């Protein structure tokens, strides 16, 4: 599926024991060197598991208040089930700030 940066997507996330999976939302933050892969950041609905809450979660196509988890994953783009929405400007700016901090790219 064709996705862009800051798209909110649904994709299967495996359980830690790898016996099953559940479809969960994530934010596309970039394309990996392999064109079949994407970098994503998970969106948990449990706010206590997250780094910062999404201000405009409804525009992201989410059903409940949600947040961004400080975790980066690489996924195959073929696993994307659908695009549900797109981050608003304020949420995208906050995500960019946190990505730079998580990756040690701040001046």
Please name every model-derived segment.
Residues 1-107:
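Conserved functional hotspots at enzyme active or ligand-binding sites that engage polyanionic ligands
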């Amino acid at each position: 599926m064709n996705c862009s940066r800051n798209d909110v997507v649904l994709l299967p996330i495996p359980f830690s024991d790898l016996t099953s999976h559940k479809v969960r939302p994530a934010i596309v933050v970039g394309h990996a060197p392999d064109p079949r892969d994407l970098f994503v950041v998970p969106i948990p609905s449990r706010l206590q598991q997250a780094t910062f809450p999404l201000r405009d979660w409804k525009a992201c196509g989410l059903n409940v208040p949600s947040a961004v988890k400080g975790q980066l994953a690489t996924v195959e783009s073929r696993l994307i089930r659908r695009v549900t929405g797109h981050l608003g400007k304020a949420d995208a700016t906050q995500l960019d700030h946190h990505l730079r901090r998580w990756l040690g790219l701040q001046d």
